[in-house]
């Protein structure tokens, strides 16, 4: 019995407390610029979950949380570059087809569809290495090929020179008879 109570005391930071703090009206998100120098760890709270509250570092040390459950150490921290995967700004009087093509190009560039397909199934380490190797090969082949430039400029000049030489040649039979 004593061992279970000491275990419960040790794991108490993982369980919500019975004392309820007044719920905040809007969720609180950490500032991405101050994540490294942050004094307090912040939990996301809403009216639906009254037992989720802001926890001070002095109350529950972060080192203990990282040791007990490392995957949950930064579970409440949100990392993102922007609010959207792809963002296309619409110009005034822009054609719908052009807008749709720009959106499709941005989605392909961001790799949103490929990421969705990849996340659909579990991928072990070997499959992940294969996928990354394939993606790197695609990127490198695109770099090697470069953009399509059409016919080579040297070829056009060579054909023009041949036409001038053909004009100087006379393969017609002379009007007179053969001398022999």
UniProtKB/Swiss-Prot annotation:
Component of the chloroplast ribosome (chloro-ribosome), a dedicated translation machinery responsible for the synthesis of chloroplast genome-encoded proteins, including proteins of the transcription and translation machinery and components of the photosynthetic apparatus. It is found in: Plastid, Chloroplast. One of its GO terms (molecular function) is structural constituent of ribosome. Residues 130-147 have a biased composition (Basic residues). Component of the chloroplast small ribosomal subunit (SSU). Mature 70S chloroplast ribosomes of higher plants consist of a small (30S) and a large (50S) subunit. The 30S small subunit contains 1 molecule of ribosomal RNA (16S rRNA) and 24 different proteins. The 50S large subunit contains 3 rRNA molecules (23S, 5S and 4.5S rRNA) and 33 different proteins. bS21c binds directly to 16S ribosomal RNA. Residues 14-45 have a biased composition (Low complexity). It comes from the Eukaryota. This is Small ribosomal subunit protein bS21c. Residues 14-49, 124-180 are annotated as: Disordered. NCBIfam families: S21p (TIGR00030). GO terms for cellular component: chloroplast; ribonucleoprotein complex; ribosome. One of its GO terms (biological process) is translation. Its main location: plastid. Keywords: Chloroplast, Plastid, Ribonucleoprotein, Ribosomal protein, RNA-binding, rRNA-binding, Transit peptide.
């Amino acid at each position: 019995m004593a061992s279970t109570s000491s275990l419960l005391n040790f794991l108490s930071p993982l369980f919500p407390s019975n004392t309820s703090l007044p719920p905040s009206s809007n969720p609180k998100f950490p500032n991405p610029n101050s994540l490294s120098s942050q004094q307090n760890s912040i939990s996301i709270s809403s009216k639906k979950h009254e037992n989720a509250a802001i926890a001070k570092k002095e109350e529950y040390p972060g080192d203990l949380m990282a040791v007990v459950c490392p995957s949950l150490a930064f579970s409440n921290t949100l990392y993102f570059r922007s609010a959207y995967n792809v963002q296309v700004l619409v110009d005034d009087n822009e054609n719908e087809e052009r807008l749709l093509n720009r959106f499709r190009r941005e989605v392909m560039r961001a790799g949103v569809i490929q990421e969705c397909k990849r996340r659909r199934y579990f991928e072990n380490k070997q499959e992940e290495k294969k996928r990354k190797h394939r993606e790197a090969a695609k990127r490198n082949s695109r770099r090697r090929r470069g953009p399509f430039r059409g016919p080579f400029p040297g070829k056009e000049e060579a054909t023009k020179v041949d036409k001038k030489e053909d004009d100087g040649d006379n393969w017609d039979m002379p009007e007179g008879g053969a001398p022999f």
